[in-house]
């Protein structure tokens, strides 16, 4: 699945496409900039091979400027998408790229039979919580000491209209 290019920074087109193994080093570099506890190249490779059914990158000027990844969860009662990771290079934020990536992965989850999407976000990451709220996500509960450093994680969900 590829989203047609749309104007990004300074009107340069941004292309959203499925990622491939060759993207891992560049994704890992961006991930290290964005997160306190990045998965790293090996963790990304393992996740892509074993769990992340949906992984997309945003590309501008031949460079990966953002990515998102997730997989499908099936409890037996409900099938939902799990948005595991999303990051945008700082200079490309506030331009709609994150929203486009989330819309792309949500569409993929829907095609795979999901009725909702779940994600976790650090309780201190107010910008991310506000971003997901704008996209229709709602906080449903909190994991105590969810992250390696002991920070709590807010679980947010969005249900697709039936």
List each language-model region with its residue ranges:
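C-terminal "cap" of GNAT-fold acetyltransferases
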Residues: 2-6, 115, 122-126, 135, ...
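Short beta-alpha junctions and helix-cap segments that line functional grooves
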Residues: 44, 142-143
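Short secondary-structure boundary/hinge segments and terminal tails
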Residues: 48, 110, 127, 149-150
């Amino acid at each position: 699945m590829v989203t047609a290019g749309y104007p990004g920074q300074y009107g340069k087109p941004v292309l959203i496409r499925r990622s491939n193994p060759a993207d891992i080093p560049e994704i890992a570099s961006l991930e290290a900039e964005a997160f306190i506890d990045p998965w790293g190249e090996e963790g990304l490779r393992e996740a892509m091979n074993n769990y992340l059914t949906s992984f997309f990158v945003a590309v501008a000027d031949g460079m990966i400027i953002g990515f998102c990844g997730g997989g499908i969860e099936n409890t037996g009662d409900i099938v939902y998408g799990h948005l595991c990771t999303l990051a945008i290079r700082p200079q490309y934020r506030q331009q709609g790229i994150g929203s486009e990536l989330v819309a792309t992965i949500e569409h993929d989850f829907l095609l795979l039979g999901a009725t909702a999407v779940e994600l976790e976000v650090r309780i201190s990451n107010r910008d991310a919580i506000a971003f997901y709220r704008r996209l229709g996500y709602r906080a449903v509960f909190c994991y105590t000491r969810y992250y390696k450093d002991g920070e709590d994680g807010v679980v947010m969900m969005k249900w697709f209209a039936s």
